[in-house]
Each structure stands twice: as structure tokens, then as C-alpha cells.
């Protein structure tokens, strides 16, 4: 059913057997009985709005829009594009939505892992605007996700992942962001596909530009050890922790050697 207003969409979604339709890339693989499918395509949620202070990404924006947006690239380099580049193919990314990727809170989500490390909020119809880090751990309900909001700030951002094949789900995914927060150098680490959903860790570290690689490795080891990992068909918990340590080291080294955004 094509909703005419957000209020109508929210009311329809309260029914037990109703589902909000995103890109249908994940929903179509399920076997749940769905009585009402709610289409949000006429509610203006398919644009990325940029202001002086934020990027506001509509829930119905596609991953391809996220990948190609020039403003996001100028602010965060290639990090945003990198987090979606390996997701199946261009045709898939032209249909899969950002809202579906975030609302699902999937363990394998590259998009969730990347955005969690940034200064990101979600806008809910009933729940208002809350931090993405809070939303990730919130119990799933029947609220509507309207947009994802990224606050602009001078931050350095890196994203990387390990996959068994190019377009497969990640074995591990890591995002590293650093910037000045209240005058203190802060580092944010997000690790996803553990295989649990992404989790966030914050450290207030003032790291000198002339730090040695061995010292960076020690920082990366500390960070990787503070996340919980699990075992599945793609890898063991120990293997994932090792990969996370390697990726975090590479991302931290890249940020430090190439210069931090605010310096």
C-alpha cells in the first residue's frame, strides 16, 4: 500500500503483519507472512540534503546515492563510498536503501559499521532524533525511520573490511574516525560483522604525528581486544579479532601519516 502521509504509514505499520518496504533486497528472501506492505516512495524520503551543519539522508535513499554524493566525498574522503563499494553490484546498490540497511541493524551491515563511528543520529517518526549508537542497541519496534543525520565536523574517517570473495558479506568490517571533541582529541572505533551487529568504542587519545608503527600497533591491539567476537562459517572469533587489529592499525596509520583533518 502506497502511504500518502507519514501518519498513515505509521498507523499502517502498527499492525502485526505489516512491513515497511525499502529496496526489497532483503525482505524478498524471507518467508514471513506479510499482510500489508507499506510503500514510502511518495513521502519525499529519497534525497540527501546538505546544510552548513549536517547531511540529512532520507531513509529511502539508495546505497548508490550514498556512494556518489559529492558532499559526503568532500567531507569524508572515500570512506563512505568504500563502505558500499563491495555490496553486490551497482544494480543492487541502485535498489537497496540506506534506511533498510540501518533499520535492520544487521550484523553484516557495512553501512551501519561506517556511520556508527561518525557523529550520526537517526530521525524516527515517533521516537524523535536519537544517536545511532543508542538506536543500534534499542529493542526493535514498529516505529518509522525517516532519515539519518550526520553532523558535520572536521574529522578524519577511514573504512575497511575483509571478505572471502569480493561481493560476499564481510568477515570483519572496521571504521575509524578521529576529531576534536570539546578540545580533546577523540578516536571512535566501530567494528561490525563480528559476526554480531556493529559496536562502538571511544578513546580520548592524543597521538603524536611522529608515533612509530609499533606504537600504533599497540593502540590497535588495545582497541581490538575490547570488542566481543563470535564464530560462524566465515571465521572464528580469534581470527576475527586478529583481522580487526590489522584493519584498525592500517586505518589509524593512514589517518596519522596523511594528516588529521583538523590539524
Regions picked out by a protein language model, each given a short descriptive name:
Residues 1-263:
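C-terminal structural segment of proteins
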Amino acid at each position: 500500500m502506497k502511504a500518502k502521509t507519514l501518519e498513515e504509514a505509521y498507523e499502517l505499520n502498527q499492525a502485526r503483519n505489516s512491513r515497511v518496504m525499502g529496496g526489497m533486497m532483503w525482505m524478498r528472501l524471507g518467508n514471513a507472512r506479510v499482510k500489508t506492505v507499506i510503500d514510502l516512495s511518495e513521502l519525499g524520503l529519497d534525497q540527501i540534503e546538505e546544510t552548513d551543519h549536517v547531511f540529512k539522508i532520507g531513509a529511502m535513499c539508495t546505497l548508490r546515492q550514498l556512494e556518489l554524493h559529492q558532499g559526503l566525498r568532500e567531507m569524508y574522503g572515500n570512506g563512505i563510498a568504500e563502505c558500499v563499494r563491495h555490496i553486490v553490484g551497482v544494480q543492487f546498490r541502485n535498489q537497496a536503501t540506506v534506511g533498510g540497511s540501518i533499520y535492520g541493524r544487521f550484523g553484516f551491515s557495512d553501512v551501519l559499521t561506517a556511520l556508527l563511528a561518525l557523529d550520526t543520529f537517526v530521525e524516527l517518526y515517533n521516537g524523535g532524533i536519537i544517536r545511532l549508537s543508542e538506536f543500534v542497541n534499542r529493542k526493535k519496534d514498529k516505529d518509522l525511520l525517516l532519515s539519518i543525520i550526520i553532523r558535520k565536523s572536521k574529522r578524519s574517517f577511514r573504512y575497511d573490511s575483509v571478505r572471502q570473495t569480493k561481493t560476499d558479506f564481510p568477515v570483519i568490517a572496521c571504521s575509524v574516525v578521529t576529531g576534536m571533541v570539546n578540545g580533546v582529541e577523540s578516536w571512535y572505533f566501530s567494528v561490525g560483522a563480528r559476526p554480531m551487529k556493529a559496536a562502538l568504542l571511544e578513546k580520548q587519545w592524543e597521538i603524536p604525528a611522529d608515533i612509530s608503527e609499533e606504537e600504533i600497533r599497540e593502540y590497535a591491539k588495545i582497541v581490538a581486544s575490547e570488542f566481543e567476537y563470535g564464530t560462524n562459517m566465515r571465521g572464528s572469533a580469534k581470527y576475527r579479532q586478529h583481522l580487526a587489529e590489522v584493519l584498525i592499525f592500517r586505518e589509524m596509520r593512514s589517518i596519522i601519516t596523511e594528516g588529521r583533518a583538523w590539524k
